[in-house]
Amino acid sequence: MSKQTFTTTFAGKPLVVEVGQVAKQANGATVVRYGDSTVLTAAVMSKKMATGDFFPLQVNYEEKMYAAGKFPGGFMKREGRPSTDATLTARLIDRPIRPMFAEGFRNEVQVINTVLSYDENASAPMAAMFGSSLALSISDIPFNGPIAGVQVGYIDGEFIINPDKEQMEASLLELTVAGSKEAINMVESGAKELSEDIMLEALLKGHQAIQELIAFQEQIVAVVGKEKAEVELLQVDADLQADIVAKYNAQLQKAVQVEEKKAREAATEAVKEMVKAEYEERYAEDENLATIMRDVAEILEQMEHAEVRRLITEDKIRPDGRKIDEIRPLDAVVDFLPKVHGSGLFTRGQTQALSILTLAPMGETQIIDGLAPEYKKRFLHHYNFPQYSVGETGRYGAAGRREIGHGALGERALEQVLPSLEEFPYAIRLVAEVLESNGSSSQASICAGTLALMAGGVPIKAPVAGIAMGLISDGTNYTVLTDIQGLEDHFGDMDFKVAGTREGITALQMDIKIAGITPQILEEALAQAKKARFEILDVIEATIAEPRPELAPTAPKIDTIKIDVDKIKVVIGKGGETIDKIIAETGVKIDIDDEGNVSIYSSDQAAINRTKEIIAGLVREAKVGEVYHAKVVRIEKFGAFVNLFDKTDALVHISEIAWTRTTNVSDVLEVGEDVDVKVIKIDEKGRVDASMKALIPRPPKPEKKEEKHD
């Protein structure tokens, strides 16, 4: 296929798609140019069904530093593991694409997005999402798209689609919404305490804008789209399914209704093991035993799936016996740990998170050097999910995509209520350790983070709580669930996380397993989430009503002084010599910004005070008319040099020593002698002249003797 180009304009920027020129061996490939951002997307599919009980979809978003005219950092000067932003963008693209493949599709699919050029005012992630959908849609991969996504901002009561950098900085909302022509299927958002009504309107505005992008994709697919390949879907043997359902459905139904998680898991596992043992023995000699046992496992999973959903939609019974809008038992604790700067333990049913606060000087902020211009990140929220939290063994290592994503969600939720840098000049790190999990651990980490911040004396604007909403839908009827647990998340259709204060929403995240959800479902879920959020805030505020007025004794204290910008180099010294000497003497940490704000950190107030004295002395300037108690440091024929303070000397000319004539300076002064002097002149080069005699009353002139006349 020869190169074909398609052009339109979206949100005020040119959107150009090129097909047929590059990556022609992939099943589908596109080059998307949005503004001056260029993204190459290639989609490929394995020829055979993969083994395993899940759909092996891999979406990558690769930031090439040359796209922004930069060298990669590090010794190797080569791109390494994906940045946090790249990982989050890959997840952002994966989530709306995944539900658009048929149930039972098991061929491996890879979608690789490579950023070739970067324009900070034209969203490369949105171009990559568009390119991912289009590459799949024009390929022979059986993708039931297209989908598209947009960013939505909110400025002065107006919604902005795909805002540029300046607009996003002024926006009260940073929303990414994706979906198909019919419905929304992915949401990711941070917001400055916006109401449910505004958030819902933003979602609908975003979905409306998506239609234009989907229509453009459909136009391209009509011209260059390939016929979809026939692939084998994972389907179980119908006779085998009927046999197992008839024999064991009642036992599995009973096991599913055990309320306590561990007991329920043990009961369902016992039924499954009994079934597997029977059919493994029955078909032990069959050459297709592996396929039969795979089908048995899939049938049992489908039976459990169907029963959980039936109980909720028909009987309105949840696995743990709760009402549809009921939250699990809550508990909130502060000061769980000694020595740390703040800690909070939050428990919701069998989900528990411990959050630990650490405060540090601003010099500890994280430097982010990606495609965008380098910047410093003051607030970090890290989320850890050890396998023991679900009573299992498993790998331990660096944070995976899920942990990075959950940490970022908590960061967005809590960042909106943090004090400004001027109010609270600290770098802030929260670490959420998930100690138990039965669903919604990311929201528990937000609640625990609020407790830790307030216990640590961080003056947040308001406490934040989070809740996860679920959905069970059969296409006609649906049930929205409050505070979903693991089983409801696993077998449900939606995981809709909502975090916020009493004033409004600070973060949203939605993932679904069906093609999309309607505005009515969104509205109902937001309303239920608000009610639940307020219940959780009641518990948090009963534990700690407001941030403590003082920091923990172990937290670094801070004092700030202002110096002239041209004095920064004096405090730092050549090669950092002066500031290093101050730090070595006092044991403090010092940060100096470009505007001359000097922040001094230490747990010892005396050390802070001593540091302030030293710096004040370094930047002190002599002023004409001021009097100083000085020390003679050098004597010359023409006068004496005296030290006024620190490194500031002045010349007392021989004529300024006394009102009477001084013949030899050394007859009057000696090195080391203390004298009081007054500054009388500072020239354009900063040289200081001082006077001793200016502090001495001038003696009266002697009266002239009258001449006698004869």
Swiss-Prot record:
One of its GO terms (biological process) is RNA processing. Its EC number is 2.7.7.8. Mg(2+) binds at D489, D495. The keyword Magnesium applies. Pfam families: KH_1, PNPase, RNase_PH, RNase_PH_C, S1. NCBIfam families: polynuc_phos, PRK11824.1. Belongs to the polyribonucleotide nucleotidyltransferase family. This is Polyribonucleotide nucleotidyltransferase. It comes from Streptococcus pyogenes serotype M12 (strain MGAS9429).
